[in-house]
């Protein structure tokens, strides 16, 4: 993390790292651990950012950029820029208006917001706020319960589903445990709380709580195919790191792939998504759009992701930092700062449009390709 803690003349943080520093000073130890912590030792959280730093920029000269722009296409619709708001649970932990405040910020910057399945604000309330939204979905043990979530989300304006597959169970978050984080009684997953809960398996002596208990309800390929067939809106799958998984997901009907490691919050020592992006893009071969999240803190990071084949990027924790510091205005400033930095990076690298951002403008990059 950059640590200058810069302020503008009005006393507001300047960069995304400055927002992060300010936000940390406003949170209790347990809330800070929940927001910033990762799985186990948190190596993947650190690596998500560090991986961008190992990729350099190689600008080209004498490229006309007058009249340039950041416009792109996201699921067939024109977007003014390729920056989206990632799904984040329980935003009422960080602002009284929770997800509604984030929706206001996203709308102010014309950014698509992905609403979490674990939203602490009813989607009906968020639907009153203008803007484009997708809905992040954890598939339920019962298909009817899953479709009830889908129907409610679509009725509230979601025009795509983001099915998260990399967290069939929770990871081990040591930092949260040490800080004593528990969800307060007045912050609940309001969409999940109203669903019937499946009976828990009765475990015999010697059976595993994980394998014989929790994983009994994990989604299968057949479950995903059925959801895709029944969904009234496109289904994008989040949590893919392996090229072979990407091609299999497309075979099952996925209409987009998000390369992600869940912000390093589920399994530690998995690779940073940016290091896997090019290999996944190559495997997909243009069949569906590919998106990426994880560790993006600068407009130059957005540029690097686009150069490696991402259609757009998703940003999570920085939006919460902005929300903590100054509500919807702060979150909006975070998104605007990223876009401004992207424009400057494009101009200085000789790119008038996002279509001009190509891999030859990067140096020092080596993906795993596995």
UniProtKB/Swiss-Prot annotation:
It is an enzyme of class 1 (oxidoreductase). Binds 1 FMN per subunit. The keyword Oxidoreductase applies. It catalyses: (S)-lactate + O2 = pyruvate + H2O2; a (2S)-2-hydroxycarboxylate + O2 = a 2-oxocarboxylate + H2O2; glycolate + O2 = glyoxylate + H2O2; 2-hydroxyoctadecanoate + O2 = 2-oxooctadecanoate + H2O2. Its cofactor is FMN. Disulfide bonds: none annotated. One of its GO terms (molecular function) is (S)-2-hydroxy-acid oxidase activity. Pyruvate binds at residues 34, 138, 173, 262, 265. InterPro entries: Aldolase_TIM, Alpha-hydoxy_acid_DH_FMN, FMN-dep_DH, FMN_HAD. It comes from the Bacteria. Residues 8-367 form the FMN hydroxy acid dehydrogenase domain. Its EC number is 1.1.3.-, 1.1.3.15. FMN binds at residues 87-89, 116, 136, 164, 238, 260, 293-297, 317. Keywords: Flavoprotein, FMN, Oxidoreductase. This is L-lactate oxidase. It comes from Roseobacter sp. (strain GAI101).
């Amino acid at each position: 993390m950059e640590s200058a803690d810069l302020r503008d003349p009005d006393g507001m943080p300047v960069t995304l790292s400055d927002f992060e520093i300010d936000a940390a000073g406003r949170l209790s130890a347990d809330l800070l651990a929940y927001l910033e912590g990762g799985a186990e030792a948190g190596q993947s959280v650190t690596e998500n950012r560090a991986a961008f730093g190992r990729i350099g920029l190689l600008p080209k000269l004498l490229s006309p950029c007058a009249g340039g722009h950041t416009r792109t296409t996201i699921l067939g619709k024109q977007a003014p820029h390729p920056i989206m708001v990632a799904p984040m649970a329980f935003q009422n932990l960080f602002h009284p208006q929770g997800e509604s405040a984030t929706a206001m910020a996203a709308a102010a910057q014309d950014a698509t917001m992905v609403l979490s399945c674990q939203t602490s604000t009813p989607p009906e309330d968020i639907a009153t706020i203008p803007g484009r939204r997708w809905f992040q979905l954890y598939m339920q043990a019962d298909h009817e319960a899953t479709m009830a979530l889908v129907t409610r989300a679509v009725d509230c304006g979601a025009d795509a589903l983001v099915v998260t597959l990399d967290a069939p169970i929770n990871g081990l978050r040591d930092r949260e445990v040490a800080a004593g984080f528990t969800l307060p009684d007045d912050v609940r997953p309001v969409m999940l709380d109203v669903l019937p809960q499946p009976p828990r398996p009765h475990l015999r002596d010697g059976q595993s709580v994980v394998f014989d208990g929790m994983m009994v309800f994990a989604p299968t390929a057949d479950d995903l195919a059925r959801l895709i067939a029944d969904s009234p809106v496109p289904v994008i799958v989040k949590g893919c790191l392996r090229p072979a998984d990407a091609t299999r997901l497309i075979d099952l009907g996925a209409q987009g792939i998000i390369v992600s490691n869940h912000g390093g919050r589920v399994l530690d020592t998995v690779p940073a998504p940016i290091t896997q992006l090019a290999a996944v893009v190559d495997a997909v071969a243009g069949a569906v759009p590919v998106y990426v999240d994880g560790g993006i803190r600068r407009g130059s990071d957005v540029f690097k992701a686009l150069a490696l084949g991402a259609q757009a990027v998703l940003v999570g924790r920085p939006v919460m930092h902005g929300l903590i510091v100054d509500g919807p205005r702060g979150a909006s400033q975070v998104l605007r700062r990223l876009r401004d930095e992207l424009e400057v990076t494009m101009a200085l690298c000789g790119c008038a449009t996002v279509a001009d951002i190509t891999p030859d403008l990067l140096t020092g990059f080596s993906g795993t390709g596995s």
